[in-house]
């Protein structure tokens, strides 16, 4: 029998959870984009909607939003830092003119506060980025033939599932199997590439008898029932080759409870809890939460089986979390379930055209209808150049995708209908991909989080970090830290003492763009024993993408009911691009400039490396990353091998570092070794190899001059006649911070201009660019770096054909407005000009109302 103390404990858990959900309010962000796919060289325009997770209303405390663009290998290639306004809105753009190769790029967005809950709490969407058209306007959806996964190191999170030709993952309803209790188990079947597999399976007991069956659908998901005796069970599947493969089920607990909430076919929702003998007479609790808000809770005894029913209409729509717990706040069983959100006419942005005919470069006037006082973003696209489906909407992201783990294929399907087929599908989705945005055991106090790993809310701009001592005996608390932030003629400074953990924090007024930052620790003679770190690497690790994200999405057209004026499209004269250019007159070169060091630096631009590059590394940013993390700057060769899994310099003459304490001078040791290398290069030695990339010899090009490396020669020539430039071995970067950038290409033609004769084997060319400065070392106890203020959003521009004649115009996004506002009647007028060839316009409008409703034109 339960006691008063049991009841008090359960009520205490409930009270702590209610208080925690009110105090620790999570945030969500959704990005609405101007298009569904892009071409290299374009801009990607977006509006961000940042809301409270408990109701999707504005009111977040964060004022800093981070938006990142990741290449197909998982590297961040572009980052934006945007200011969130009082409505929770921010807008900006990402430039696609400096990418190295087409492919599927990921955009993710998060606040620093969101990173406390990992990558699953952040926004993510994958876009195809196609090759730039060979001629203006000749858009073809072409992605590089070579797979990025084969030519780029993959820095995304490792796959936790050991892949074979057939894989099965099991998800017991409620979280675990319990011996002696019947329960449902969902499963996911996939192949070695992570693609869904439809298959029929059999559940076998320890003696090989069939005790159950289950089939996976087109999503690879299915469910079967485990009998009360669940020890030694195996699930058997037949693979595509007709061979059977068996998979053991997760180990079962000897004691505990199981939860069952099957998809109902009527207007009710029922769940049941069963427990082993030790739990049947105990007083337990259950709690129902909806997006972080406590909706219902109560105590109960399991007995021979506890049953509870609700009317579906009495429960909140969307994703709900049902938790069964004991008096300590420990979860006994838990699951998510999804209730179909009923559509409403007020959720729709209606678009009517006041233009009857679509003409080249002609004006288009639209009238938008939505809830009065709504604010949303709007895009008009050339339908003939849209090569990808629309992907997730603001509604599907806020109500579903943000509450589960992983990518949801065809997420719009779960918002189509509330029939039995869709209910079963959402039930399987919740069982397989359910993610606990709210960790109930943390909320109840059963398990605590390390406060030192907690990221604060950035309600303004901050500079934070910590002081790290290179010897444990040196103190880090109470050390004065001075900060100087300056740009041009503007500056600000401050000073504070570090706390007991060596941490510091400075707040800044709103600043825009990049500023110089200097941090100095007041440690005087001991400054060589301290490093000053900066917090700015708190983004989530790159996640492994689903193969279903890396393909074109199905089209869901939303074209305007406009008829193209065919006659005008065929007969209207247009100025060509060349006719619009103003050519400068030619000038005679009177004298040649002397080749100075500055001219050499100008000549050794990175355009050659950029032209050939498959892979690019920003060494300055890489150096900052090491310093931000409180690490010593590594040797260039050590960094290169760590950075790329394809690089092998282990058996080369590269200097690879000294063992033990760095009391000796590595520069002197490297100089001796460099002298030995130069002797070997000039002694007539047949072949010196300087590392391999994917098993192929590396040719090193330093500041556009041949430096070292290569493969065996196709023909024999004297050593001194082999290179077409000076051998710059002594100038090669020793430490990472001496290099500026690295470009890698597997094209065998890249090194031809630097070396004669051709190689007898395929080589990989690595272009290394330096700062043209003496070898430099960072001063200990002082950090000279940069501070990124808010990025200034660009302004979307379009021609005004009322002031100019029609001309060739190949805009794919005809119009983008991140801030459309309806009047008191709920109306807004949009006007823009068509391009020269668009015959059908596709539109996209999305937003979130102040009361948390997701609105769109879908």
Each predicted region: which residue ranges?
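Contiguous segments within soluble domain cores/interaction surfaces
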Residues: 7-32, 37-84, 116-117, 283
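Surface-exposed, low-complexity/disordered segments
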Residues: 22-24, 35, 39, 60, ...
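Internal, hydrophobic beta-strand segments that form the core of beta-sheet-rich folds
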Residues: 47-48, 68, 105-113, 323-324, ...
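Extended, solvent-exposed regions of the mature portions of secreted/cell-surface glycoproteins
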Residues: 70-71, 77, 220, 284-297, ...
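Short beta-strand segments within Ig-like beta-sandwich modules, predominantly Fibronectin type-III
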Residues: 81-84, 212-218, 298-303, 494-499, ...
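Ligand-binding face of N-terminal immunoglobulin V-set domains in extracellular IgSF glycoproteins
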Residues: 90-96
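Beta-propeller domains
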Residues: 195-198, 207-223, 230-234
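Short, surface-exposed beta-strand/strand-loop-strand elements in extracellular ectodomains
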Residues: 201-203
């Amino acid at each position: 029998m339960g006691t008063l103390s049991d009841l008090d404990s359960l009520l205490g858990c409930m009270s702590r959870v209610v208080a925690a959900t009110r105090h620790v309010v999570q945030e969500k962000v959704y990005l609405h984009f101007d298009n569904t796919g892009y071409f290299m060289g374009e801009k990607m325009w977006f509006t961000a909607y940042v809301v409270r997770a408990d109701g999707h209303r504005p009111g977040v405390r964060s004022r800093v939003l981070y938006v990142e663009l990741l290449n197909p290998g998982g590297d961040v290639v572009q980052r934006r830092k945007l200011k969130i306004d009082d409505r929770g809105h921010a807008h900006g753009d990402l430039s696609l003119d400096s990418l190295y190769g087409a492919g599927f790029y990921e955009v993710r967005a998060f606040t620093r506060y969101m990173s406390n809950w990992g990558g699953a709490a952040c926004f993510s969407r994958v876009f195809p980025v196609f090759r730039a058209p060979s001629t203006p306007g000749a858009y073809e959806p072409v992605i590089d033939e070579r797979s990025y996964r084969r030519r780029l190191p993959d820095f995304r999170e490792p796959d936790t599932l050991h892949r074979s030709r057939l894989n099965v993952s099991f998800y017991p309803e409620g979280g675990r199997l319990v011996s002696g209790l019947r329960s449902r188990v969902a499963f996911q079947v996939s192949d070695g590439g992570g693609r869904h597999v439809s298959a029929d399976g059999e559940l076998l007991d320890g003696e090989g008898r069939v005790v159950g069956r289950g089939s996976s659908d087109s999503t690879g998901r299915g469910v079967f029932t485990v009998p009360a005796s669940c020890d030694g069970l195996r699930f058997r599947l037949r693979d595509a080759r007709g061979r059977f493969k068996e998979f053991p089920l997760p180990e079962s607990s000897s004691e505990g409870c199981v939860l069952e909430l099957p998809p109902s076919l009527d207007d009710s929702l029922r769940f049941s809890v069963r427990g082993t003998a030790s739990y049947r007479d105990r007083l337990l609790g259950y709690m129902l939460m909806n997006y972080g808000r406590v909706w219902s809770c109560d105590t109960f005894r399991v007995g021979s089986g506890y049953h509870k029913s609700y009317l579906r209409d009495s429960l909140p729509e969307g994703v709900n979390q049902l938790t069964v717990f004991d008096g300590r706040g420990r979860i006994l069983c838990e699951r998510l379930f999804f209730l179909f959100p009923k559509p409403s006419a007020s959720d729709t942005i209606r678009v009517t055209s006041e233009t009857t005919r679509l003409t080249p470069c002609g004006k288009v006037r639209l009238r938008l209808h939505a809830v009065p006082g709504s604010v949303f973003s709007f895009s008009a696209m050339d339908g003939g150049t849209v090569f990808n489906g629309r992907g997730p909407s603001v509604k599907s992201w806020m109500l579903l995708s943000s509450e589960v783990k992983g990518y949801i294929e065809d997420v719009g399907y779960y918002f189509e209908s509330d029939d039995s087929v869709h209910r079963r599908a959402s039930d399987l989705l919740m069982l397989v991909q359910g993610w606990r945005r709210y960790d109930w055991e943390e909320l109840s106090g059963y398990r605590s989080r390390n406060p030192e790993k907690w990221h604060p809310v950035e309600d303004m701009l901050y500079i934070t970090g910590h002081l790290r001592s290179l010897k444990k005996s040196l103190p880090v608390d109470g050390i004065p830290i001075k900060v100087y932030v300056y740009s041009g003629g503007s500056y600000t400074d401050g000073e504070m003492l570090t706390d007991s953990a060596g941490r510091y924090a400075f707040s800044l007024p709103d600043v825009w763009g990049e500023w110089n930052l200097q941090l100095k620790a007041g440690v005087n003679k001991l400054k060589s024993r301290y490093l000053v770190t900066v917090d700015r690497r708190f983004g989530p690790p790159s996640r492994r993408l689903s193969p279903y994200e890396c393909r074109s999405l199905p089209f869901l057209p939303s074209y305007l009911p406009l008829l193209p004026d065919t006659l005008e499209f065929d007969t209207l004269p247009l100025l060509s691009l060349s006719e619009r250019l103003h050519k400068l007159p030619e000038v005679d070169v009177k004298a040649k400039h002397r080749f100075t060091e500055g001219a050499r630096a100008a000549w050794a631009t990175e355009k050659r490396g950029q032209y050939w590059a498959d892979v690019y590394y920003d060494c300055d940013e890489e150096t900052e990353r090491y310093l931000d993390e409180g690490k010593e700057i590594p040797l260039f060769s050590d960094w290169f091998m760590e950075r790329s899994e394809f690089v092998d310099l282990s058996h080369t003459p590269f200097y690879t570092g000294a063992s033990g304490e760095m009391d000796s001078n590595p520069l002197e040791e490297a100089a001796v070794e460099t002298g030995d290398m130069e002797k070997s290069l000039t002694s007539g030695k047949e072949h010196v190899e300087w590392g391999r990339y994917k098993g192929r010899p590396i040719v090193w090009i330093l500041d556009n001059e041949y430096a070292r490396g290569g493969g065996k020669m196709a023909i024999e020539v004297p050593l001194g006649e082999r290179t077409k430039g000076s051998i710059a071995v002594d100038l090669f970067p020793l430490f990472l911070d001496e290099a500026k950038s690295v470009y890698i290409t597997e094209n065998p033609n890249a090194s031809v201009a630097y070396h004669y004769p051709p190689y007898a084997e395929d080589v990989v060319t690595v272009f290394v660019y330096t700062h043209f400065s003496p070898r430099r070392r960072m001063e200990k106890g002082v950090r000279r770096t940069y501070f990124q203020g808010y990025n200034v959003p660009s302004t979307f521009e379009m021609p005004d054909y009322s002031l100019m004649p029609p001309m060739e115009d190949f805009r794919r996004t005809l119009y983008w407005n991140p801030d459309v506002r309806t009047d008191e009647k709920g109306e807004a007028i949009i006007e823009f000009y068509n391009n020269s060839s668009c015959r059908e316009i596709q539109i996209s409008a999305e937003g979130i109302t102040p009361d948390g409703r997701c609105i769109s034109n879908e």
